[in-house]
């Protein structure tokens, strides 16, 4: 990576603007930011590491830094069953649409197994609404890019990359990324998908594994680690051979080697694939100190990867993904919103934030301290880079334009998007500053990330089915099917305290 593009000790450059005080005349960027005040108020269950409340805190930081005035803020629409069935099977969509926690208690085990419902992917109240909200921003965001209404769209609630065509996986139920890419393919011949989540983007690769119109590139922790896929030799099949790029990394990779490899691979992809649009999944579990992650990336490095992709100048959709240390998820995505907008952000979190007292230190980019040695040798990374670039050189000619199962173009898309925005503007509340606030009970649970009190369950209820339990299980280690299959890899800081809770699977 050339030293003139990114310096490891700084993130912002001379082209980035200082955020103007409230009331100042500012220039809006051609960026759309999707958010809905309800999307962060769902609850996977007590002890479950996935906290949608992180979205509320992230949006609070975005508002506190006064970023909405620099972009178009759009209320995420809810998708309907037909929208989601563009990718997912009818049986699975019907299940998601009708299942409730109470109904789940009476369902046969084979039905739950069919859709991979369990500890990782529980049934919780409002499951269908949650899915339609987080996916709505990705699908409509793709439509805005298709019609050149924006250069960049941001949907932090999206990026749930593990969901499969007919089953849930890895905390993900509906694959909003696949739905968004299918929309983009209506107007773009070639779409590039980049994934910097610590977990392999298996659901997206699987969906496009035999396509030469979508290239998937995943930088992920490899080995005995969920989902257990993403070998460097996994390169796609049929027409899609060499269009799946996997960059398997070992634990505790540091900033400089990660960024060097990232730029080398992505520049090679840009040269050989020449995408017309890009989707970037920004899972923040690749940060150092993540509760489930094992990388050692700083906030600067993670954001620098986003900045590099933005610099390619292609229509860009930016999505969230994993991330299980709530404060750092909010910090990361708020920071990257500013990077996308080209803003120079004060490192001190504004006192106007509703959650500023939970950030200790009260900094946007605190120093994260690695607890493991980097397991990625220079020789190993060089071999990964060499093999990846060789794979890219195997691409012959331009990808085909035709692709099976692409739905027809809707002629009324622009009118519908504009109508949605008109209705939003005429409503009494302003989405730009309607932050939302989680309940005090939920707030305490989310920020006190290791619950010191044992969960209480009503007699006779199976907590694994209703989202009140999340633990570990030593079964099924080859290959891992869920996060709970990889007990040695999914670490919590206070293991002994969880052991005292008598959670099954904790020795």
Curated annotation (Swiss-Prot):
Residues 482-501 have a biased composition (Basic and acidic residues). One of its GO terms (biological process) is nematode male tail tip morphogenesis. Residues 444-507 are annotated as: Disordered. GO terms for molecular function: histone deacetylase activity; histone deacetylase activity, hydrolytic mechanism; transcription corepressor activity. It catalyses: N(6)-acetyl-L-lysyl-[histone] + H2O = L-lysyl-[histone] + acetate. It comes from the Eukaryota. InterPro entries: HDAC_PDAC (IPR050284), His_deacetylse (IPR000286), His_deacetylse_1 (IPR003084), His_deacetylse_dom (IPR023801), His_deacetylse_dom_sf (IPR037138), Ureohydrolase_dom_sf (IPR023696). The keyword Lyase does not apply. Keywords: Chromatin regulator, Hydrolase, Nucleus, Repressor, Transcription, Transcription regulation. Residues 29-342 are annotated as: Histone deacetylase. The active site is at 162. Its EC number is 3.5.1.98. One of its GO terms (cellular component) is histone deacetylase complex. It is an enzyme of class 3 (hydrolase). It is found in: Nucleus. The keyword Transcription applies. It holds the Pfam family Hist_deacetyl. Probably responsible for the deacetylation of lysine residues on the N-terminal part of the core histones (H2A, H2B, H3 and H4). Histone deacetylation gives a tag for epigenetic repression and plays an important role in transcriptional regulation, cell cycle progression and developmental events. Histone deacetylases act via the formation of large multiprotein complexes. As a likely component of a histone deacetylase complex, together with saeg-1 and hda-2, functions downstream of the cAMP-dependent kinase egl-4 to regulate the expression of genes required for egg-laying and forgaging. PANTHER family: HISTONE DEACETYLASE 2-RELATED, HISTONE DEACETYLASE HDAC1-RELATED. Belongs to the histone deacetylase family. HD type 1 subfamily. May be a component of a histone deacetylase complex containing saeg-2, saeg-1 and hda-2. This is Putative histone deacetylase 2. It comes from Caenorhabditis elegans. The gene is hda-2.
């Amino acid at each position: 990576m050339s030293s003139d593009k990114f310096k490891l000790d700084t993130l912002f450059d001379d082209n980035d603007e200082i955020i103007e005080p409230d009331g100042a005349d500012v220039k809006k960027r051609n960026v759309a930011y999707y958010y809905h005040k309800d999307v962060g108020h769902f609850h996977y269950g007590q002890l479950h590491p996935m906290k949608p409340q992180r979205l509320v805190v992230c949006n609070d930081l975005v508002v506190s830094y006064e970023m909405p005035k620099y972009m178009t803020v759009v209320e995420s629409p809810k998708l309907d069953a037909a929208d989601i069935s563009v990718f997912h099977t009818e049986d699975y969509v019907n299940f998601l649409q009708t299942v409730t926690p109470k109904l789940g208690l009476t369902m046969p085990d084979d039905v739950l197994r069919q859709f991979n419902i369990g500890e990782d992917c529980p049934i919780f109240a409002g499951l269908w609404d949650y899915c339609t909200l987080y996916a709505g921003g990705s699908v409509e965001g793709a439509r805005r890019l298709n019609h050149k209404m924006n250069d960049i769209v941001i949907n932090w609630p999206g990026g749930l990359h593990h969901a499969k065509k007919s089953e849930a996986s890895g905390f993900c139920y509906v694959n909003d990324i696949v739905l968004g890419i299918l929309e983009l393919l209506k107007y773009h011949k070639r779409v590039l998908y980049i994934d910097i989540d610590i977990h392999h983007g298996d659901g997206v690769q699987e969906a496009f594994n035999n396509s030469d119109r979508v290239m998937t590139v995943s930088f992920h922790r490899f080995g005995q680690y969920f989902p257990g896929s993403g070998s460097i030799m996994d390169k796609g099949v049929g027409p899609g051979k060499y269009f799946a790029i996997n960059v398997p990394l070992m634990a505790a990779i540091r900033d400089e080697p990660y960024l060097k490899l990232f730029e080398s691979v992505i520049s090679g992809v840009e040269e050989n694939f020449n995408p017309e649009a890009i989707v970037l999944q920004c899972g923040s579990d690749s940060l150092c100190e993540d509760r489930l992650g094992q990388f050692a990336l700083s906030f600067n490095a993670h954001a620098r990867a986003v900045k590099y992709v933005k610099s390619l100048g292609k229509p860009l959709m930016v999505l969230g993904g994993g991330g299980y240390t709530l404060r750092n998820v909010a910090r990361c995505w708020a920071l990257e919103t500013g990077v996308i907008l080209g803003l120079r952000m004060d490192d001190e979190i504004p006192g106007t934030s509703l959650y500023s007292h939970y950030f200790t230190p009260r900094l946007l980019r605190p120093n994260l301290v690695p607890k493991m040695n980097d397991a990625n040798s220079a020789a190993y990374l060089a071999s990964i880079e060499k093999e990846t670039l060789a794979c890219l050189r195997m691409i012959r000619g331009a990808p085909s334009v035709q692709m099976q199962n692409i739905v027809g173009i809707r002629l009324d898309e622009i009118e519908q998007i504009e109508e949605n925005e008109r209705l939003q503007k005429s409503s009494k509340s302003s989405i730009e500053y309607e932050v939302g606030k989680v309940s005090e009970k939920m707030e305490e649970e989310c920020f006190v990330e290791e619950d010191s009190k044992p969960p209480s369950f009503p007699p006779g209820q199976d907590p694994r089915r209703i989202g009140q339990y999340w633990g570990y299980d030593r079964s099924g280690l080859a290959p891992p099917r869920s996060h709970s299959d990889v007990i040695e890899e999914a670490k919590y800081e206070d293991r002994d305290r969880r052991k005292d809770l008598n959670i099954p699977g904790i020795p």
